[in-house]
């Protein structure tokens, strides 16, 4: 752990040093430094907008008859028909519209990593995740008939449960209750869509089975959540990491 912390410290110091040097480097050129300028403004030695005047009679800026700025008939600024400023059909001005295009949304890597560690996030279920497949537990229901019924039909019951992260619940009972409800609902809807219905006995047995599976899922997720918090506390309490954080704060403030 100590060696890893020292390597992290060296990496961040090198990165921030390079960023600091880049910020101090003067940028070449800039506004009003000569060369090409905004259209219609002169410059000491650079390119200019096409010279004013010089056209024939009725040509204010060098275009043909009825061409105010050098375009064709009905072209106000040099574009084609229906092109206000030189772009194609429905384009308002070449690269200007490209600058205003919204940037693509960035994927939140933190959320992706969390979903991969905890389970697959199910779309359309409001943040529920689908746990890993489990072996269906061997259970007894108080009478031989239900025990036999379960053994003969256990493959019709779910072997995965839907759940939310454990930190969204106050206790195990709330987690298990929510887990049982959403799992049975999703399984019955999916199975009914395939043309198979469940009896009251199926629902009764399924509730017991899924409850046991949700309890197992809670214990697994609680242990992983506790281990993750403990590892984070140990990492951020080590002297090299404290020194690294202090150095980064100093660079940002300075």
UniProtKB/Swiss-Prot annotation:
Residues engaged in binding Cu(2+) 1: 61-63
GO cellular component: cell surface; cytosol; dendrite; endoplasmic reticulum; Golgi apparatus; inclusion body; membrane raft; nuclear membrane
Propeptide: 232-254
Keyword field: Amyloid, Cell cycle, Cell membrane, Copper, Disulfide bond, Glycoprotein, Golgi apparatus, GPI-anchor, Growth arrest, Lipoprotein, Membrane, Metal-binding, Prion, Repeat, Signal, Zinc
Binding annotation for Cu(2+) 2: 69-71
Cystine crosslinks: 179-214
Lipidation (GPI-anchor amidated serine): 231
Signal peptide: 1-22
Annotated region (Disordered), positions in chain: 25-106
Membrane topology, from the record: Lipid-anchor; GPI-anchor
Gene3D superfamilies per record: Prion/Doppel protein, beta-ribbon domain (1.10.790.10)
Location of region: Interaction with ADGRG6: 23-38
Xref: SMART domains: PRP
Sequence repeat windows: 51-59, 60-67, 68-75, 76-83, 84-91
Sequence positions that bind Cu(2+) 3: 77-79
GO biological process: amyloid fibril formation; cellular response to amyloid-beta; cellular response to copper ion; cellular response to xenobiotic stimulus; intracellular signal transduction; learning or memory; negative regulation of activated T cell proliferation; negative regulation of amyloid-beta formation
Effect of residue 199 to A: Accumulates intracellularly
Domain of life, per lineage: Eukaryota
Skewed-composition ranges (Gly residues): 52-95
Annotated glycan sites: 181, 197
Keyword tRNA-binding in annotation: no
Similarity comment text for this entry: Belongs to the prion family.
Annotated domain remarks: The normal, monomeric form has a mainly alpha-helical structure. The disease-associated, protease-resistant form forms amyloid fibrils containing a cross-beta spine, formed by a steric zipper of superposed beta-strands. Disease mutations may favor intermolecular contacts via short beta strands, and may thereby trigger oligomerization. Contains an N-terminal region composed of octamer repeats. At low copper concentrations, the sidechains of His residues from three or four repeats contribute to the binding of a single copper ion. Alternatively, a copper ion can be bound by interaction with the sidechain and backbone amide nitrogen of a single His residue. The observed copper binding stoichiometry suggests that two repeat regions cooperate to stabilize the binding of a single copper ion. At higher copper concentrations, each octamer can bind one copper ion by interactions with the His sidechain and Gly backbone atoms.
Role of this protein: Its primary physiological function is unclear. May play a role in neuronal development and synaptic plasticity. May be required for neuronal myelin sheath maintenance. May promote myelin homeostasis through acting as an agonist for ADGRG6 receptor. May play a role in iron uptake and iron homeostasis. Soluble oligomers are toxic to cultured neuroblastoma cells and induce apoptosis (in vitro). Association with GPC1 (via its heparan sulfate chains) targets PRNP to lipid rafts. Also provides Cu(2+) or Zn(2+) for the ascorbate-mediated GPC1 deaminase degradation of its heparan sulfate side chains.
Implicated disorder: Found in high quantity in the brain of humans and animals infected with degenerative neurological diseases such as kuru, Creutzfeldt-Jakob disease (CJD), Gerstmann-Straussler syndrome (GSS), scrapie, bovine spongiform encephalopathy (BSE), transmissible mink encephalopathy (TME), etc.
Protein name: Major prion protein
Gene name of the encoded protein: PRNP
């Amino acid at each position: 752990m100590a060696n890893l912390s020292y390597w992290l410290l060296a990496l961040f110091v090198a990165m921030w040093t390079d960023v600091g040097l880049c910020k101090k480097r003067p940028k070449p050129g800039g506004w009003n430094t000569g060369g090409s300028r905004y259209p219609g403004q002169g410059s000491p030695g650079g390119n200019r907008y096409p010279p004013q005047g010089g056209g024939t009679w009725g040509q204010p800026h060098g275009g043909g008859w009825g061409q105010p700025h050098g375009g064709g008939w009905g072209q106000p600024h040099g574009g084609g028909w229906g092109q206000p400023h030189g772009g194609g059909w429905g384009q308002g001005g070449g690269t200007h519209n490209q600058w205003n295009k919204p940037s693509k949304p960035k994927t939140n890597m933190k959320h992706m990593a969390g979903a991969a560690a905890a389970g697959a996030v199910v779309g359309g279920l409001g943040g529920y995740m689908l746990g890993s497949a489990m072996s269906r537990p061997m259970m007894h229901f108080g009478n031989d008939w239900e025990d036999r019924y379960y053994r003969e039909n256990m493959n019709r019951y779910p072997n995965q449960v839907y759940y939310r992260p454990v930190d969204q619940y106050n206790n195990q009972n709330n987690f298990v209750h929510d887990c049982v409800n959403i799992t049975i609902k999703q399984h019955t809807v999916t199975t009914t869509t395939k043309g198979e219905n469940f009896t009251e006995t199926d629902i009764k047995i399924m509730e017991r089975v899924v409850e046991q599976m949700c309890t197992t899922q809670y214990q697994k997720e609680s242990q992983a959540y506790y281990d993750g918090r403990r590892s984070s506390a140990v990492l951020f309490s080590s002297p090299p990491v404290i020194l690294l954080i202090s150095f980064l704060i100093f660079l940002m403030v300075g």
